[in-house]
C-alpha cells in the first residue's frame, strides 16, 4: 500500500498549478499539469486590441475521492480530501501596426501569484490504517511565456495560435507530501477559436498539446497530454451572458520513471461541465464566474472547481 500512498502524493503535488497557469489534478506526476484545465472557455480566440491587457484568475478546487485507472475508488485509500486555492495574473501585449502571415502579433507572460493546498487521506497498511496529511502555500509557484502568438479576426470567427512555455518558479521538494510546484517545464502548442454563429451566441474552444520535460528532482517524466476547453454562451442582454463550459482531457503517453514507463502508464482522463455567467459592460472588460463538475475520471482526483476571472485593458 505504500505505492498507493506515493501515487496519491503524485496525484496532489501539482494540483494547484493545473488551475493557475494561464490553472487541477490528473494522471501525470503530481496528478497535475502545467496548463490550466477549464479556464479558457470565453472569447479565447479573440486577441485583444493593440496595447496591454491583463487577465486575473482566482479559483478553488475541492475533491473527496481519488480514482484509479478503471475509474474506481483507489484501493487502500480512504477519507481522501483535497482543497486547493490559487491566483494567476496574465499580461498580454498586442504589438501595434505589426502583422505576420496576416495575423496580429501578441506576446504573453503569466505568473501564478499564490497557491494554497491542503491534503489529507488514510492509507490501509498491513499494520493498520495510517493517516497522512500535508499542506503547502506560497507565492509565485509557476510562470508562463509565449513570445509570439498570432491572431486572425473575421466577421464571425476569431482565431489565435502559437506556442506557450510553462516553467516552475519555486523549488520542488521530493521529501514533502505536498508541493505547490510541478517541478518540470512544458512546451505547449495551442489553438484558440471563437465563433459567433448568430448575434448573441458564442462558441469557444481551446485545444492544447503538452510535451512535458523531466522533473530533475524525481527523475519522473509526465506523459504527453491533450486537452480541449469549451464554452457555449448566450447573451441575455448586451452586458450579460450565460452558458455552459468545461473541458475534455486525455493523457496520451505513459509516465516514465528513470526512463521506463511506470506500471499501468498512469494515464489520466477527465471530462467536466458546468454553468457560467459573465458580465461585460464593454468589449474590453469582463467578469466571469463559472463552476465545473468532473466525470469520466481515471488516475486522478474527481471533484469540483470554481473560477472567477477578470479581463480588462491597461
Regions found by a protein language model. Give the residues of each.
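Surface-exposed strand-loop-strand hairpins of Gram-negative outer-membrane beta-barrel proteins
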Residues: 28-33, 61-86, 122-136, 177
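Outer membrane beta-barrel transmembrane domains
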Residues: 31, 73-74, 216-314
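Residues on the lipid-exposed face of transmembrane beta-strands in outer-membrane beta-barrel proteins
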Residues: 44, 56, 89-93, 145-150, ...
Amino acid at each position: 500500500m505504500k505505492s498507493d500512498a506515493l501515487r496519491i502524493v503524485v496525484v496532489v503535488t501539482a494540483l494547484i498549478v493545473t488551475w493557475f497557469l494561464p490553472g487541477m489534478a490528473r494522471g501525470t506526476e503530481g496528478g497535475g499539469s502545467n496548463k490550466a484545465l477549464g479556464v479558457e472557455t470565453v472569447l479565447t480566440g479573440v486577441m485583444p486590441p493593440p496595447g496591454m491587457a491583463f487577465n486575473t484568475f482566482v479559483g478553488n478546487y475541492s475533491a473527496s475521492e481519488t480514482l484509479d485507472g478503471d475509474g474506481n475508488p483507489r484501493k487502500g485509500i480512504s477519507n481522501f480530501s483535497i482543497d486547493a486555492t490559487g491566483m494567476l495574473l496574465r499580461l498580454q501585449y498586442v504589438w501595434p501596426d505589426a502583422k505576420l502571415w496576416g495575423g496580429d502579433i501578441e506576446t504573453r507572460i503569466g505568473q501564478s501569484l499564490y497557491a494554497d493546498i491542503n491534503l489529507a487521506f488514510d492509507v490501509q497498511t498491513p499494520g493498520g490504517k495510517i493517516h497522512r496529511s500535508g499542506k503547502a502555500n506560497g507565492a509565485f509557484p509557476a510562470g508562463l511565456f509565449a513570445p509570439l502568438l498570432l491572431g486572425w479576426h473575421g466577421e464571425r470567427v476569431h482565431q489565435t495560435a502559437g506556442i506557450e512555455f510553462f516553467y516552475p518558479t519555486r523549488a520542488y521538494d521530493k521529501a514533502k507530501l505536498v508541493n505547490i510546484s510541478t517541478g518540470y517545464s512544458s512546451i505547449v502548442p495551442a489553438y484558440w477559436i471563437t465563433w459567433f454563429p448568430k448575434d448573441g451566441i458564442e462558441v469557444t474552444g481551446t485545444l492544447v498539446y503538452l510535451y512535458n520535460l523531466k522533473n530533475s528532482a524525481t527523475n519522473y517524466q509526465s506523459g504527453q497530454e491533450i486537452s480541449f476547453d469549451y464554452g457555449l454562451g448566450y447573451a441575455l442582454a448586451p452586458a450579460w451572458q450565460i452558458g455552459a463550459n468545461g473541458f475534455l482531457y486525455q493523457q496520451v503517453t505513459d509516465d516514465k520513471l528513470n526512463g521506463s514507463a511506470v506500471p499501468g502508464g498512469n494515464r489520466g482522463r477527465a471530462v467536466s461541465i458546468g454553468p457560467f455567467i459573465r458580465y461585460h459592460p464593454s468589449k474590453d472588460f469582463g467578469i466571469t464566474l463559472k463552476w465545473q463538475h468532473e466525470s469520466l475520471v481515471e488516475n486522478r482526483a474527481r471533484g469540483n472547481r470554481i473560477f472567477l476571472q477578470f479581463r480588462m485593458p491597461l
